Amino acid sequence: MAYPLQLGLQDASSPIMEELTNFHDHTLMIVFLISSLVLYLISLMLTTKLIHTSTMDAQEVETIWTILPAIILILIALPSLRILYMMDEINNPVLTVKTMGHQWYWSYEYTDYEDLCFDSYMTPTNELKPGELRLLEVDNRVVLPMELPIRMLISSEDVLHSWAVPSLGLKTDAIPGRLNQATVTSNRPGVFYGQCSEICGSNHSFMPIVLEMIPLKLFENWSVSMTQ
């Protein structure tokens, strides 16, 4: 959940987001070390009075600054490829939800159930209840079981959209005529907020996403009540 004046990432609520947070810290540490080294070398160059007027080349130095960046790139690429594979791989999902983007709302269809589909519009400010969040609440939340792999099929009916929930590490483009997929898994129950993350027109800022993750038993009761 985001909060005012937040400078860091949202708390990770899924295995993928935990991996992304660790990768962010790993990459940031490498960038910090490189920046410190470069600043140190620049300060030496500005303060030293020693010069080499007779040096034409330095094969050893050139070898080092060719091999060292290659090693650094490998250290960044290997965990990145691992996370990309984790985000793309979906093994035996217990549920499939089809998400369609529209100007300017989302529609959801639970493909494993008959007639379980609905549209999700932003709740206007004058209809908000005490404690609800402005520009983030919707009239129909997406209810899903926690701690289980769920496949989201994402597309669009009109223009480009992007279905994003930061605390779950989700951001998938909704492209007309193309079906993208993403894995949704939550480590704990809760309500998770997101928004359309692709500029899609004048009301782009009014396309919130709300996921409510609950235990499986409660989800079964909810699905029965929605299909009756």
UniProtKB/Swiss-Prot annotation:
Residues 46-59 are mitochondrial matrix. Binds a dinuclear copper A center per subunit. It is found in: Mitochondrion inner membrane. Residues 1-14, 88-228 are mitochondrial intermembrane. Keywords: Copper, Electron transport, Magnesium, Membrane, Metal-binding, Mitochondrion, Mitochondrion inner membrane, Respiratory chain, Translocase, Transmembrane, Transmembrane helix, Transport. Its cofactor is Cu cation. CDD domains: CcO_II_C. GO terms for molecular function: copper ion binding; cytochrome-c oxidase activity. Its main location: mitochondrion. The chain crosses the membrane at residues 15-45, 60-87. It catalyses: 4 Fe(II)-[cytochrome c] + O2 + 8 H(+)(in) = 4 Fe(III)-[cytochrome c] + 2 H2O + 4 H(+)(out). Mg(2+) binds at E198. The keyword Translocase applies. Component of the cytochrome c oxidase (complex IV, CIV), a multisubunit enzyme composed of 14 subunits. The complex is composed of a catalytic core of 3 subunits MT-CO1, MT-CO2 and MT-CO3, encoded in the mitochondrial DNA, and 11 supernumerary subunits COX4I, COX5A, COX5B, COX6A, COX6B, COX6C, COX7A, COX7B, COX7C, COX8 and NDUFA4, which are encoded in the nuclear genome. This is Cytochrome c oxidase subunit 2. The lineage of its organism: Eukaryota, Metazoa, Chordata, Craniata, Vertebrata.
